[in-house]
Swiss-Prot record:
Swiss-Prot/TrEMBL keywords: Cytoplasm, Ribonucleoprotein, Ribosomal protein, RNA-binding, rRNA-binding
Name of this protein: Large ribosomal subunit protein uL2
Stretches for region Disordered: 207-233
PANTHER family named among the record's database cross-references: LARGE RIBOSOMAL SUBUNIT PROTEIN UL2, RIBOSOMAL PROTEIN L2
NCBIfam families reported in the protein's UniProt record: PRK09612.1 (NF007180)
Organism: Aedes albopictus (Asian tiger mosquito)
Protein family per UniProt: Belongs to the universal ribosomal protein uL2 family.
GO biological process, one term: cytoplasmic translation
Gene Ontology cellular-component terms listed: cytosolic large ribosomal subunit
Recorded GO MF terms: rRNA binding; structural constituent of ribosome
First-listed, main subcellular location of the protein, grouped into a coarse class: cytoplasm
Localization in the cell: Cytoplasm
Amino acid sequence: MGRVIRAQRKGEGSVFTAHTKKRKGEPKLRALDYAERHGYLKGTVKQIIHDPGRGAPLAVVHFRDPYKFNVRKQLFIAAEGMYTGQFVYCGKRAQLQIGNVLPIGLMPEGTIVCNLEEKTGDRGKLARTSGNYASVIAHNPDTKRTRVKLPSGAKKVLPSANRAMVGIVAGGGRIDKPILKAGRAYRKYKVKRNCWPKVRGVAMNPVEHPHGGGNHQHIGKASTVKRGTPPGRKVGLIAARRTGRIRGGKGDEKFKEKEKK
């Protein structure tokens, strides 16, 4: 067998781990406590900041400690429309306004939310990327469950006690602007992780990649591989259910007409 390929090296970590040195901190919802379960807490957005390596901006929110004379600083993923000086309310009795945090079971069907909890009290795991959002579809009061549509389009049933922030994650449309030059791509990925530039497998030598080698750049074999393929060979279309063009869409009408002719 050839050398240890890039995919095997990535699995080990080392130089491929995320660059977190200049990050501002982990943004998450308040820890679930008695005040949020039975009432609400009022916070103030002090600052909207940029977090290197993240597309969405962060909001620095100050809360009064409900149990002692103290101010607690919290990092939230900013929702679109949040501003400095805004009052943010977290809890069961909070109103349905952009930036507020409340249980999804109390939101009307069709509400757009972000930073959604997957398990009650985990402080936000779903719909956190810039421009992303989840939507509340339906409630089941008997089982205390709520059906939610995730950014991927998948529908998931979650406990109604799970909290979420009302609104869409800020920074939408970020990927619409083209990168245009290599310097911007270099700086973009330098602050994220070591994954750029990415050399194609067909451009390598046969000892470095299963797709490498040959008098011209071609894979030379089927690019689909089994799920149980050993590391070093497991590259390409892994356990693909199907390959090729997806037929039946709007773009295939002209293609069908040409075939008939």
